[in-house]
């Protein structure tokens, strides 16, 4: 594939895209990726990373975050922090996702993450779909988190950052077991939603969450009516 006269090859190794772009004076190259698109609870986290020229020697274990175990991801995260020339993260709350929609939140977050980098990139590589508005040239790379080093690095930073947030949320909402499933749809998460209804960290615009919210409201309404009915027999007015 050629882009602006630069030959970009998927089989050139994990650092191939960056080497080619830097060789043609288009660097530094920033990679952007996100974590949490498929979750129904918790934030969307977007990361942007520019790797230092010598990063290759420090990132032998770098790969798409989804291919790494949680323990190895945490270790690779520290490697990326040491090897990054610049990095940034943007955390978009569940409430903001409900307000603007997932796609808009994701696109806006990517732009903000790139804008917050301490070093201005000359080129931006994104994972999967094209994004305009970075202020510099950009290219979408299909499965970029598997074939482009800076995108893989961004995927690790986004995933580890979000996982840490979800573990922290678990201490506030232990009944949902966020530390285990990280807000994604699992049988255990669905059972917790059915049992407890959604909390403030759930994305209320999502169909499965909205359904449980409606069921919970109905159940609470029935319980309230029952309580008022019972207490009325005893001549007591209860305000709930």
Swiss-Prot record:
It catalyses: Endonucleolytic cleavage to 5'-phosphomonoester. It holds the Pfam family RNase_HII. Keywords: Cytoplasm, Endonuclease, Hydrolase, Manganese, Metal-binding, Nuclease. Its main location: cytoplasm. SUPFAM superfamilies: Ribonuclease H-like. It is found in: Cytoplasm. One of its GO terms (biological process) is DNA replication, removal of RNA primer. It comes from the Bacteria. Manganese or magnesium. Binds 1 divalent metal ion per monomer in the absence of substrate. May bind a second metal ion after substrate binding. One of its GO terms (cellular component) is cytoplasm. PROSITE patterns: RNASE_H_2. A divalent metal cation binds at residues 33-34, 127. Its cofactor is Mn(2+); Mg(2+). GO terms for molecular function: manganese ion binding; RNA binding; RNA-DNA hybrid ribonuclease activity. It is an enzyme of class 3 (hydrolase). Residues 27-226 form the RNase H type-2 domain. Its EC number is 3.1.26.4. Disulfide bonds: none annotated. PANTHER family: RIBONUCLEASE H2 SUBUNIT A, RIBONUCLEASE HII. Endonuclease that specifically degrades the RNA of RNA-DNA hybrids. Belongs to the RNase HII family. This is Ribonuclease HII. It comes from Frankia casuarinae (strain DSM 45818 / CECT 9043 / HFP020203 / CcI3).
């Amino acid at each position: 594939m050629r882009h602006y006269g630069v030959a970009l090859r998927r089989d050139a190794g994990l650092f191939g895209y960056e080497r080619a772009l830097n060789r043609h004076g288009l660097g530094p190259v920033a990679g952007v990726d996100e974590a949490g698109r498929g979750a129904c609870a918790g934030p969307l986290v977007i990361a942007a990373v520019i790797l230092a020229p010598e990063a290759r020697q420090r990132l032998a274990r770098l790969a798409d975050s989804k291919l790494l175990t949680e323990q190895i991801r945490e270790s690779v995260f520290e490697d990326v922090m040491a090897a990054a020339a610049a990095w940034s993260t943007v955390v978009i709350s569940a409430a903001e996702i409900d307000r603007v929609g997932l796609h808009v939140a994701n696109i806006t977050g990517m732009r903000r993450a790139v804008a917050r980098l301490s070093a201005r990139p000359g080129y931006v590589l994104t994972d999967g779909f094209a994004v305009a508005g970075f202020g510099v040239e950009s290219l979408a790379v299909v499965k970029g988190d598997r074939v482009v080093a800076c995108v893989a690095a961004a995927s690790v930073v986004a995933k580890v950052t979000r996982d840490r947030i979800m573990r922290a949320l678990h201490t506030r909402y232990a009944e949902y077991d966020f530390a285990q499933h990280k807000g994604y749809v699992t049988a255990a998460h669905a059972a917790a939603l059915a049992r407890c209804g959604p909390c403030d960290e759930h994305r209320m615009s999502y169909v499965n969450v909205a359904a449980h919210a409606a069921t919970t409201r109905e159940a609470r309404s029935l319980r309230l009516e029952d309580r008022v009915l019972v207490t009325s027999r005893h001549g007591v007015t209860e305000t709930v």
